[in-house]
């Protein structure tokens, strides 16, 4: 777990594939930190952000551990600015889906926070519409 966390401190090193692999197969405590470290590694540009986001999107959807899904949502929000279309739109749609449908309230809250922090007018409008329709409070 400490290794997965500390790898995020070296985003220029060749750490992307080991972090992706950890997020796929390791224990929950390691996956949790691998998600956060992938955000740091991916923030160095689109070439690293895109594969990091691809794995984070998968983990957001299928990981059995709520804390890993929550960290994946946070990490996707952090990577958003480094991504290009259509990946940015996929991140928004996945976070919206998670915010509305995840069975854990903490994961839903983290997805909403990630969306709000994107500071994208069209995303904020969608959130406001969901509030007005009574789907969000």
Segments predicted by a language model, with ranges:
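Structural detector for internal amphipathic alpha-helices that build alpha-solenoid repeat scaffolds
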Residues: 1-12, 21, 32-47, 67-86, ...
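Amphipathic alpha-helical scaffolding segments comprising HEAT/armadillo-like alpha-solenoid repeats
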Residues: 12-24, 44-60, 82-99, 121-132
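Short inter-helical turns and helix N-cap capping residues of alpha-solenoid HEAT/ARM repeat scaffolds
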Residues: 26-27, 64-65, 103-104, 134-135
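Short, mixed-charge aromatic SLiMs
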Residues: 31, 100-101
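Residue-level recognition of hydrophobic positions within alpha-helical transmembrane segments
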Residues: 98, 105-106
């Amino acid at each position: 777990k400490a290794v997965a966390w500390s790898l995020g401190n070296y985003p220029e090193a060749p750490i992307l594939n080991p972090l992706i692999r950890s997020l796929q197969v390791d224990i929950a405590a390691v996956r949790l930190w691998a998600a956060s470290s992938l955000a740091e590694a991916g923030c160095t540009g689109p070439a690293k952000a895109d594969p990091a986001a691809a794995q984070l999107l998968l983990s957001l959807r299928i990981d059995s551990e709520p804390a890993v899904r929550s960290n994946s949502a946070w990490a996707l929000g952090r990577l958003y600015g480094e991504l290009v279309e259509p990946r940015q739109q996929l991140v928004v749609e996945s976070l919206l889906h998670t915010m509305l449908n995840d069975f854990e309230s903490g994961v839903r809250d983290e997805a909403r926070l990630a969306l709000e922090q994107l500071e994208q007018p069209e995303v904020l409008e969608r959130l406001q519409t969901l509030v007005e329709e009574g789907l969000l409070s």
